[in-house]
Amino acid sequence: MQGMSYPNALAFELSCATGWRIGDVLSLRTSQLCEEMTITEQKTGKTSKKRVPYALFCRLREQAGEEWVFPSRRAGKHRTRQAVWADVRRAARLVGLETHVSPHTARKIFAVEDCRKNGLAHTQHELNHRDSAVTALYAFSDTIIPDYKLNELAGIIAEIVIDKLAKK
């Protein structure tokens, strides 16, 4: 499937599932990998604990390298935000999304879904935002990018994951 590599699609999926920034996702060490993961956010220094869906956890465990969950081709390094960004942009263009789409869009997808299910205050807590106005920008970002386009992007990412699983 053109657009995204499997590891980058998996990183985007983990960001969608947890609301974690892509930099935090990519810097996960294999030793941190469990169904309920705790990270210290690079940007804020705050702790975030999330339960990862079991099927996603299994795919992450399969994907993980010796040191990093998302290893780079360069020894001892993890994948970069820039590599994921390029893949996300390619996938967005495939579905005709010309608005700004980046790995951070995964965090917004998380916010939209979480706010619909649990309300703005819960989403603010989940994203570790100090200001609810910032959370509102994330949670209502689907009014800026239409749902059907976000669903198409999510579909492309799901296809990549399914293709990879089918080839095993």
What are these regions, as identified by a protein language model?
Residues 1-22:
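Basic, Lys/Arg- and aromatic-enriched nucleic-acid-binding interface segment
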Residues 2-8, 86-125:
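Short, basic (Lys/Arg/His-rich) helix/loop patches that form interaction surfaces
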Residues 15, 26, 124:
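The alpha-helix within a helix-turn-helix
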Residues 27-58:
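Conserved tyrosine-mediated DNA breakage-rejoining catalytic core shared by Y-recombinases
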Residues 30-36, 119-139:
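Short, polar N-cap/turn motifs at the start of nucleic acid-interacting alpha helices
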Residues 41-45, 127-152:
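Catalytic-site neighborhood detector that most strongly recognizes the C-terminal catalytic loop/helix
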Residues 51, 55, 140-168:
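DNA/chromatin major-groove-contacting recognition/catalytic segments
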Residues 54-98:
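Active-site/catalytic core of tyrosine-dependent DNA strand-transfer enzymes
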